[in-house]
Amino acid sequence: MRTDQTFWGESFVHKLLGLMLLIPALHFYGLNSKQIGFGTKGLFSYVSLGLVWGSLFFALAYLIEIALLLSQGNLVRLDFYVSAYSVSGNIGQQRGLLFLLICLVGNLINVLMEEGIFRGLFQKVFERKYSFLKAAFFSNLLFGFWHTMGPFRSFLDGEMSLTGFWINSLILILTSFLIGFQFALMTKMTGSLYMGMAVHFVNNTVVNLLHVLSKGGVDQLLSLRITVAQTLSFLMLLLFYKKRKRSRNEVL
């Protein structure tokens, strides 16, 4: 069902299906929601930390983008409206409250499903045989391949050539893997999915709501913005992770 071509402007049926399949999958593998990171302990504090963390690094990325455009004399203004993300950039422009709610709820569904499956279920299943780092590698490689559905859909719709499909797929596999690996580290460090979920939610939501208008168009430097935010976030997280690992002498 192509809900991305309807009033909703977003594909969410498969994400709802993924959430529904998560429950029997947990039962099949002898796991429960708490074991994969959905416990109630630290829920508010880790969600708050994730929201602050994600917002901080995107704020820095926006500032860098704005400074760059100002130096070139190309900045027009910032704008706030709901758009949909595609592999070729943000599309659509909706300013109604209903569309804002759809955006927020849709991103929440997406975050619950992806974190529950890739950083929760798959991570725990792989950890039965491999170390944390190897398990994170495999689960987030799958997360990367999951994101090739976007360019594949564009290819089927005739919006992208076969070459474009392969190039965009490779880029998405790599970037999604690195971002997912970051969320896996957050889950390992906090013992729950909530910080990663909150950062994931900020990542998906902010690019759909806060837009940079320049003389060249809307969100012309979107890829740069995302790259800067994720790179800074990942580097800072790695510093905390290595410091924590040394202090606890953990074998991961």
Where are these regions (language model features)?
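Aromatic-anchored segments of alpha-helical transmembrane domains
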Residues: 1, 55-62, 141-149, 201-211
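Alpha-helical transmembrane segments in multi-pass membrane proteins
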Residues: 1-30, 38-40, 45-55, 76-102, ...
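Residue-level signature of the transmembrane alpha-helical core
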Residues: 12, 16, 47, 51, ...
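Short juxtamembrane and helix-loop transition motifs at transmembrane-helix boundaries
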Residues: 62, 97-102, 154-164, 191
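Transmembrane alpha-helix/helix-exit interface in multi-pass inner-membrane proteins
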Residues: 62-71, 136-156
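Membrane-interface interhelical connector segments
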Residues: 79-87, 117, 151-165
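Membrane-interface helix/loop boundary segments of multi-pass membrane proteins
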Residues: 113-142, 188-192
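C-terminal membrane module of polytopic membrane proteins
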Residues: 201-252
